[in-house]
Amino acid sequence: MALGWRVSGTNRSEQKVIEARSIGISSMIFDQGTPLKEPEKVFSDVTHIIASIPPSEIGEIALLLHSDELRDAASLTWVNYLSTPAVYGDRSGGVASEFDEPTPTSKRGERRLAAERAWIDTFSDTRVSVQIMRIAGIYGPGRSVIEQVAAGRARIIEKEGQVFNRIHVDDIG
């Protein structure tokens, strides 16, 4: 926004919409299963999309509801789908990289891999570049160990030699 970009987004709650608008982000409600109002208008001047909505049991909801409008968005050039390393499955302590074939072993991983493929397939015959970012170990405000302990969500992970990546929430967007 400081560089002149206009940023828009969706949220599931009215409170989050209000918070986004308070910092200059145009925001609207998009709840799983409810299509956006006037999607053609919403997507008419969109150039970039960062998609972070977790897929549901029935699939990638944004595409199930709006793939036609997104494909018809003449100004759209780039999509980044935020996925998870869960698509690599259980590597028994081994390291996974983007060159490894995804072999999910959980429902979450299977759904995310299906969503990745849905985004890629939706734009496969267009000029839109689709990128997949598999992020893990998110930390930042609302995600610290102290906050997890206070909320009763803290976990102890004891695995000899385990390594993992960390990324600050501000560095994702």
Regions found by a protein language model. Give the residues of each.
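Non-catalytic, hydrophobic alpha-helical segments
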Residues: 49, 172-173
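Conserved Rossmann-fold NAD(P)-dependent oxidoreductase catalytic core, especially the SDR/UDP-sugar
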Residues: 67-107
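NAD(P)-cofactor binding segment of oxidoreductase domains
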Residues: 39-81
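Rossmann-fold cofactor-recognition segment
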Residues: 22-35, 51-55
